[in-house]
Amino acid sequence: MSTAVRSGRVSSWESFCQWVTNTDNRIYVGWFGVLMIPCLLAATICYIIAFIAAPPVDIDGIREPVAGSFLYGNNIISGAVIPSSNAIGLHFYPIWEAATLDEWLYNGGPYQLVVFHFLIGISAYMGRQWELSYRLGMRPWICVAYAAPLSAAMVVFLIYPFGQGSFSDGMPLGISGTFNFMLVFQAEHNILMHPFHMLGVAGVFGGSLFSAMHGSLVTSSLVRETTESESQNYGYKFGQEEETYNIVAAHGYFGRLIFQYASFNNSRSLHFFLAAWPVVGIWFTSMGIATMAFNLNGFNFNQSILDAQGKVVPTWADVLNRANLGMEVMHERNAHNFPLDLATTESAPVALQAPAVG
């Protein structure tokens, strides 16, 4: 009887597979990382070059280029990678689709390159979170929580331009450009009066409040393991089995500060709540922007409230309406003649009948 002995030599591909999926590496790569790393590198390199040296972009498609780079007079606050031209619309616009490199730059090609590689990269990062959790035997909720900011990036860079019909409506990649996007979004969609945005505000601000409350309660109820002359941080050893703070004391304090049932007596349910509150809020905001992308806008109160004598009762809705009209008038000043919201009178026919002769 003969036995076959397999050679101990491992192929290069097997070595690569073992390295990619090895959880003992200082930084886990994973199969999603194989996609993530080149995409994020491409997006980052192109973004830096464009922010420094990209020529002006004809964002509105009316031959009035907008400069966004350092070399054309911007600083870190005003600079941005300008979205691709309205003349391109929703067309996929890689470098090889343009006749020349100058044309590609003039029409805002770098914006699409950065955004598409960035979205693929951050999506792969979420997959990598799941992959590492799976290999370590952990539960998958880390990538679920990360899906909230991922969805926010998806809606402002992809879904909103799709709904509006052009990547020129996407969010510029810069500080002032982001603020401009927010103001124009409010002017055109009244996002402040959208219930999903309100839930998102509650999620973000509430999450900040709960995080501060939790951190301060834990810090205030640490189990003392050190002397008065030492920092309390030295009382914790990484991996120790004992609780580092007294949850009973924290529970008792908070229950007396507000009322008993406002305080969690289960550490697991407490931390789930701390994670779920902001995540659900950001998901709602993303859904709100996705609906407004297709012009299902926030509540509008275009008609002022009148009293019995027909006089206007001033409300904050009136202030918001005037602010929206002002922002709409100011943005893209040369792209359209007059905002339709301000055209309150009926249009008169110009040449529907022939003039009388003789």
UniProtKB/Swiss-Prot annotation:
Protein's cellular compartments: Cellular thylakoid membrane
Swiss-Prot/TrEMBL keywords: Calcium, Chlorophyll, Chromophore, Electron transport, Herbicide resistance, Iron, Magnesium, Manganese, Membrane, Metal-binding, Oxidoreductase, Photosynthesis, Photosystem II, Thylakoid, Transmembrane, Transmembrane helix, Transport
Details of cofactor binding: The D1/D2 heterodimer binds P680, chlorophylls that are the primary electron donor of PSII, and subsequent electron acceptors. It shares a non-heme iron and each subunit binds pheophytin, quinone, additional chlorophylls, carotenoids and lipids. D1 provides most of the ligands for the Mn4-Ca-O5 cluster of the oxygen-evolving complex (OEC). There is also a Cl(-1) ion associated with D1 and D2, which is required for oxygen evolution. The PSII complex binds additional chlorophylls, carotenoids and specific lipids.
One Pfam family recorded for the sequence: Photo_RC
Site positions per UniProt: Cleavage: 343-344
Residue ranges crossing the lipid bilayer per the database entry: 28-45, 117-132, 141-155, 196-217, 273-287
Positions with a binding annotation for pheophytin a: 125
Positions that bind chlorophyll a PD1: 197
Record-listed E.C. numbers: 1.10.3.9
Site (Stabilizes free radical intermediate): 189
Residues that coordinate or bind Fe cation: 214, 271
Site-annotated residues for Tyrosine radical intermediate: 160
Main localization of the protein described in the UniProt heading: membrane
Positions with a binding annotation for chlorophyll a ChlzD1: 117
Membrane topology qualifier: Multi-pass membrane protein
Binding site for [CaMn4O5] cluster: 169, 188, 331-332, 341, 343
Propeptide, chain numbering: 344-358
Quaternary assembly: PSII is composed of 1 copy each of membrane proteins PsbA, PsbB, PsbC, PsbD, PsbE, PsbF, PsbH, PsbI, PsbJ, PsbK, PsbL, PsbM, PsbT, PsbX, PsbY, PsbZ, Psb30/Ycf12, peripheral proteins PsbO, CyanoQ (PsbQ), PsbU, PsbV and a large number of cofactors. It forms dimeric complexes.
Physiological role: Photosystem II (PSII) is a light-driven water:plastoquinone oxidoreductase that uses light energy to abstract electrons from H(2)O, generating O(2) and a proton gradient subsequently used for ATP formation. It consists of a core antenna complex that captures photons, and an electron transfer chain that converts photonic excitation into a charge separation. The D1/D2 (PsbA/PsbD) reaction center heterodimer binds P680, the primary electron donor of PSII as well as several subsequent electron acceptors.
Family, per entry: Belongs to the reaction center PufL/M/PsbA/D family.
Protein name as it appears in the record: Photosystem II protein D1 2
Species this chain originates from: Synechococcus sp. (strain RCC307)
